[in-house]
UniProtKB/Swiss-Prot annotation:
InterPro entries per UniProt: Homeodomain-like_sf, HTH-type_Tx_Regulator, HTH_TetR, Tet_transcr_reg_TetR-rel_C_sf
Keyword annotations from UniProtKB, A to Z: DNA-binding, Repressor, Transcription, Transcription regulation
Name listed for the protein in its UniProt record: Uncharacterized HTH-type transcriptional regulator YdgC
PANTHER family: ACREF/ENVCD OPERON REPRESSOR-RELATED, TRANSCRIPTIONAL REGULATOR, TETR FAMILY
Segments forming domain HTH tetR-type: 6-66
Gene: ydgC
Species per Swiss-Prot/TrEMBL record: Bacillus subtilis (strain 168)
GO annotation, cellular component aspect: protein-DNA complex
Length: 195
């Protein structure tokens, strides 16, 4: 595809993400997508067969990017304790930054997508695998069930994204700091370990 065609396709995808985010899949219209992108309706069909096809592409792209991002966040071997908390903070902040960079795509990919529940299960599984590998490296308590930790992390990220990130109430850095402080240091004052 020529560069003009690539740019046109990107504009249509961006406009579609916004339309689906605002109206939902069923109420979104191809006529509104092309209007937002500055195209005619026939030009839409040069790039996509249907509204379903462009929605599916947006979802597939979001899911694959989330998975790649999650897989890339595995902590490397040889970190000291202080560096582990810094790297965990960086990893959680990176996830929130990703979800914040295209709020329309996040809304449809993480919340409106009929496959969102399965996507989050897949995300939790990749996180669990990362956490178990990091646990074997001695970064986390050996008695923690990393499946539970992964599910908690996904739930926290999902809820905080919907409540604070997509609404603009909090930014990725502050959300990441709160999540990491809770998970790494807990809610009790220093020195009050419950084990």
């Amino acid at each position: 595809m020529k560069s003009k065609g690539v740019e046109s396709r990107k504009r249509l995808l961006k406009a579609a993400a916004n339309e689906f985010s605002v109206r939902g899949f069923h109420d979104a219209k191809v006529s509104e997508i092309v209007k937002k992108a500055g195209f005619t309706q026939p030009s839409f069909y040069l790039y996509f067969q249907s509204k379903e096809a462009i929605f599916a592409e947006l979802i597939t792209d979001f899911h694959s990017r989330v998975r790649k991002l999650t897989e890339s966040l595995l902590l490397e071997n040889g970190l000291n304790t202080e560096d582990v908390s810094k790297r965990v903070l960086l990893a959680v902040e990176t996830v929130f930054q990703f979800l914040d960079e295209d709020k329309d795509l996040t809304k449809i990919g993480f919340f409106l997508n009929p496959e969102a529940k399965q996507m989050k299960k897949d995300l939790a599984m990749v996180l669990k695998e990362n956490l178990e590998a990091e646990q074997r490296l001695g970064y986390f308590h050996s008695e923690l069930d990393m499946e539970t930790v992964a599910e908690c992390l996904v739930g926290m990220i999902e809820h905080l994204t919907e409540s604070f990130l997509l609404t603009g109430i909090k930014d990725p850095a502050s959300l990441a700091a709160e999540v990491v402080n809770l998970l790494i240091y807990g809610m009790l004052p220093k020195g009050n370990d419950v084990r």
